[in-house]
């Protein structure tokens, strides 16, 4: 019976030592990962509002309507209201 108690105490002591060592390494990792003052304020910008306007204009230029059936020489559809020279463009 005494052997069982001593063995249990020894196993519990081993688990406690192992848990303490894991806790210490976790605390060391947390202190190493804290950023310095120079790394705290970082802003990243991938464009500005003017860039968005240029992208929108490029998309609009690339998207053309099919020629309207009454005016095959006009590359714009009369519904787009972009071709002022088209006679089929309702104004």
From Swiss-Prot:
Q: Give residue ranges for the propeptide.
A: 20-65
GO BP terms in the entry: defense response to bacterium
Q: Where is this chain's protein located in or outside the cell?
A: Secreted
InterPro entries given in the database record? Alpha-defensin, Alpha-defensin_N
Q: In which tissues is it expressed?
A: Paneth cells of the small bowel.
What is stated as this protein's family in its record?
Answer: Belongs to the alpha-defensin family.
What does the function comment of this entry state?
Apparent precursor of a secreted, cationic, proline- and cysteine-rich peptide that contains Cys-Pro-Xaa repeats. Unlike cryptdin, the proposed mature peptide region lacks the structural motif characteristic of defensins. It may have microbicidal activities.
- Provide the protein name: Alpha-defensin-related sequence 12
């Amino acid at each position: 019976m005494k052997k069982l108690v001593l063995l249990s105490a020894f196993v519990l002591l081993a688990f406690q030592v192992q848990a303490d060592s894991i806790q210490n390494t976790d605390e060391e990792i947390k202190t190493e990962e804290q950023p310095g003052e120079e790394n705290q304020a970082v802003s990243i910008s991938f464009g500005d509002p003017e860039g968005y306007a240029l992208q929108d204009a490029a998309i609009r230029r690339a998207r053309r309507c099919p020629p309207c059936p009454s005016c095959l020489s006009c590359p714009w559809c009369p519904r787009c209201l972009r071709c002022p020279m088209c006679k089929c463009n309702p104004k």
